[in-house]
Regions:
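Conserved catalytic or regulatory cores that recognize and/or transform ribose-phosphate-containing ligands
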Residues: 1-160
Length: 160
């Protein structure tokens, strides 16, 4: 079993919780049973752990340091961390990423998983591996561009 920590911006906001719900559902439905050997190894039994779903209801009941320490404790027992879109603007996500890097926990960005899944599906459907890889790379570039644009819009809103 591969334990995968899901790092997603939260800040106690309902819209972030709703987005995290969608991400976790996609990961569990599509990636939990989808046998992608990379980036998580050959084990097809992925367990996705979301601190928002475990501790989110306590966001306004404990101080920030206590909450982030719980998150890091959870992360410390994981094999990998998935960084969800918007992590760049989140203090908590950045702390989790730094911890993961310092402790040799595999880091992957959600858009990389989406591209990997599309490549695998294309190859399984009979597409040439090289063509599927090019299509996956193009998809990854498009997803990253959209994530960057979303981040810029979010930053512009917070300035205004």
């Amino acid at each position: 079993m591969t334990k995968i920590y899901v790092s997603h911006p939260f800040g106690g906001l309902a819209k972030n919780k709703k987005n995290a719900d969608s991400v976790l559902k996609w990961l569990q439905d599509d990636m939990g049973v989808f046998p992608i050997k990379e980036p998580f190894g050959s084990d097809t039994h992925n367990i996705f752990l979301s601190p928002i779903h475990m501790f989110g209801h306590l966001y306004n009941k404990v101080d920030y340091d206590t909450g982030i320490n719980w998150c890091v404790d959870l992360l410390s027992g994981c094999d990998a961390i998935v960084m969800c879109n918007g992590w760049e603007n989140s203090i908590g996500c950045n702390l989790e990423l730094a911890y993961a890097k310092d402790h040799n926990i595999k880091v992957i960005h959600i858009n990389e998983l989406k591209a990997a899944k599309s490549i695998r599906l294309a190859v399984d459907a009979g597409m040439d591996k090289a063509i599927a890889a090019l299509a996956g790379f193009a998809m990854l570039q498009a997803l990253n561009k959209k994530a960057k644009e979303d981040l810029q819009r979010e930053r512009a809103k917070s300035v205004n």
